[in-house]
């Protein structure tokens, strides 16, 4: 029986030694779907999940994880990768979604303003924040956004290092959704970090 969210959160622990029992890949895939529903900064979802079930690949992953028991004994491994480079693709997907959502006759003034504001966000602000040539523009953007921020609310994390941190935090939120979902169906997990 699937647990409630509160039960799953209370139950979830990092398990570092797994029994030699198979787990249902379809259930793991559903947990990955749940992971994709995690909140992310600007709805950009700057991460990818790789679900590894092949025994040879699992063996290579265990080596890459420095022989940790959690990796050596896992029946399946899910790798979460931050992908800051996907911002253009994800922003375009959000713009397409906006176009489809607001593609109807007789939009109210409020709906037209909402569409314009969201479209400007993904077509103007996001490219301004994520575009940087060798980190040179980061300082200029940082100073500009700090000054503008004195007069109105504005996004202030605009340097390359800020964007990397945003991507990692979003990936962490998605990974947490995945681990809680796994706990809810009675499967144990163990987060391991690496670069």
Q: Where in the sequence are the language-model features?
A:
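Acidic, surface-exposed loops and disordered segments
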Residues: 1-195
């Amino acid at each position: 029986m699937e647990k409630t969210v509160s039960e799953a959160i209370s139950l979830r622990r990092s398990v570092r030694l797994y029994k030699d029992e198979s787990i249902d890949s379809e259930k793991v895939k559903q947990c990955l779907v749940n992971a994709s529903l995690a909140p992310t900064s600007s709805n950009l979802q700057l991460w990818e999940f790789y679900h590894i079930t092949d025994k040879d690949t699992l063996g290579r992953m265990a080596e890459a994880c420095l022989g940790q028991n959690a990796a050596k004994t896992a029946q399946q491994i899910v790798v979460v990768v931050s992908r800051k480079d996907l911002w253009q693709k994800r922003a375009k997907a959000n713009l397409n979604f906006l176009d489809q959502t607001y593609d109807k006759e007789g939009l109210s003034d409020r709906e037209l303003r909402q569409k314009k504001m969201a479209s400007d966000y993904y077509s103007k602000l996001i490219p301004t924040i994520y575009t940087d040539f060798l980190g040179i523009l980061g300082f200029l953007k940082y100073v500009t956004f700090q000054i503008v921020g004195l007069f109105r609310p504005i996004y202030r994390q605009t340097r390359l290092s800020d964007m990397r941190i945003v991507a990692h935090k979003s990936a962490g939120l998605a990974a947490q959704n995945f681990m809680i979902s796994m706990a809810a169906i009675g499967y144990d997990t163990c987060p391991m970090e690496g670069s």
